[in-house]
């Protein structure tokens, strides 16, 4: 018989709740050694009271049993309802966690954009301050050469970013590793361009006819930009990609941000290293256009080097800002083609003695690039 029936019939005082707390005294484990002949618990119960309780318990109706059954039914129903509640709680938890993760991702992306914007603004501000300093020390002519070279290099660097986006998409580089690839690519670009500028300066000082060769390169690049159709996102037939894949044994998957990993006991390169190699070779190919273009504006190696350096330093942060919206700058590439064609014609005219001032060159470069950007933004707003 359950304890509830005993309480109901008055043997024990009724409790205010379903939980009964009994205080059991603690007896020493060596009670027999102390001379006690009976169990300590038997000493607590009055024999007459125990027999009376047994007689009354034998005549009680099975009320407590029915109450126990009701309790079991209620517990069973609660157990049956519990999975549904758990499912609802799990669904709510999943939805709330997805919302939280989405909000966290948006917050992190916003913070990344803010940091990149500040970095780009700092690089541009530093370049402007440097150009003003050159103007104060060397005159307006040198400052115009620097700004013309800087704007030209910056626009060509933005054009390079179109190819970087295609390379990252082709090799499926995770977003968290793209900055590492760009860092190595920019470091290699600085070293290569510095070497190329020194060699180009020495060559132009000895061989004036090299100007015609550089002008031909710029005119050919301008023609290619005008004649090229929509960017092909499939780089499987690209010469640089095929060359790197031929000479660099690469695994089929990434291994974190590592450039090398062991595959079947053999040390192989990961696709991340292959991506860096393609980025480096692509920048070398672009430098063949950009370096002659700056030499078409100025022959001062210091101006050529510093304008390149300032244009490249903020390239990684600039990529973060405009990588998602590059498709919207559809008129930027034709405007760059106009600039390259103009610089090529200018170099040919300079070779034959017809000089175009640096200020005029700066105006043509700035006007062409700004027109391309404004046309792209206008076309975007009209489509939306």
From Swiss-Prot:
It is found in: Plastid, Chloroplast thylakoid membrane. Keywords: Chloroplast, Membrane, Plastid, Thylakoid, Transit peptide, Transmembrane, Transmembrane helix. One of its GO terms (biological process) is thylakoid membrane organization. Residues 49-115, 167-180, 228-275, 323-335, 379-384 are stromal. Interacts with ALB3. This is Thylakoid membrane protein TERC, chloroplastic. The chain crosses the membrane at residues 116-136, 146-166, 181-201, 207-227, 276-296, 302-322, 336-356, 358-378. Disruption phenotype: Pigment deficiency and seedling lethality. Integral thylakoid membrane protein that plays a crucial role in thylakoid membrane biogenesis and thylakoid formation in early chloroplast development. Is essential for de novo synthesis of photosystem II (PSII) core proteins and required for efficient insertion of thylakoid membrane proteins, presumably via interaction with ALB3. May assist synthesis of thylakoid membrane proteins at the membrane insertion step. Disulfide bonds: none annotated. Residues 1-48 form a transit peptide. GO terms for cellular component: chloroplast thylakoid; chloroplast thylakoid membrane. Residues 68-104 are annotated as: Disordered. It is a multi-pass membrane protein. Residues 137-145, 202-206, 297-301, 357 are lumenal, thylakoid. Expressed in roots, rosette and cauline leaves, stems and flowers. Residues 76-88 have a biased composition (Basic and acidic residues).
